[in-house]
Amino acid sequence: MWAYAIKAKKVIATDVSSLHELQKLEKDADWLWIDCFEPNPEEFQLVSELLCIDEKILDDMKMGRAFPRYKKHNDCTLLSISVATIQNELKTYPIYIGVKERLVMTTRKPGSSKPVERTIQTVKDCVEEMEKANPTFVVCEVLRETSNENLEVMMALREVIETVEEEAIARPSRKALTKKVFALKREIAVLYRLLWSEEQMMSSLKDGLIPNLEPCEASVLGLKDAMDNISRELEFLNSYDNALDGILRLQDLGMIHRVEKTLIYLTIVIVAMNLILIAMEIGILDLLLGL
């Protein structure tokens, strides 16, 4: 567990392991950022004691459960943010942020580390120039970096959809293709909900509707830009979903074409059989007349 104490526009990084150390750092610093990477049970207990959160919320954090809006417990505000990744399939990983007076705490997993690590670097690089570097700035930057990370998933998703479209044109009748299409539609639905939830959280933060958080003008502008990007990507997700619907319609047309071909073959066979039967009947009549 690392603590970043900000005092006199300097960042002092310290590895801490006890509540006493954290309380001392908090007392001496202008404000304090505590970052937990894959917290163990002891560190979760420290989080609970420092933020004064109840067991239910702590259990949600341990299990990696996301909550769609902020939670307020005593004088602590808790936020849940999800980071999406896509390799063989879409996966989401949580970041939890707790804010209390001059303290901000983040907990994360390997899959959700990049936004926090980038924000840590931003604070280190810019703390001397920033007039209003505070816990709210950290929350805004983590949100902005998370949205950037999630938007990168869109590019990977688009590439997968293009590959499926090429397969559909080449071999529209493949049953495996239908499974891929429905799997992609599920992933699009998950990503849509995730981005929409982020946009709503940014909007609430921008408008000052989340307790303990008061973004400065620069942070508000950053949030607006991120929200504009998310709105644009949500439109793209709708177009991706429509493209997948087009693939399903193409498969339906292919199935109809196959049925039509089968009916044509059956009709030819039936006509041929009828001709044979007629020929056989004529042959029998000729034999009877000859007799």
Where are the predicted features?
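Peripheral, non-transmembrane regulatory/ligand-interaction domains of membrane transport proteins
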Residues: 1-210, 225, 229-239, 265-268, ...
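Hydrophobic alpha-helical transmembrane segments
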Residues: 204-225, 242-248
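Charged, long alpha-helical assembly modules
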Residues: 217-242, 258, 285
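Membrane-interface, cytosolic juxtamembrane amphipathic helix immediately N-terminal to a transmembrane helix
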Residues: 234-269
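Bilayer-spanning, highly hydrophobic alpha-helical transmembrane segments
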Residues: 257-291
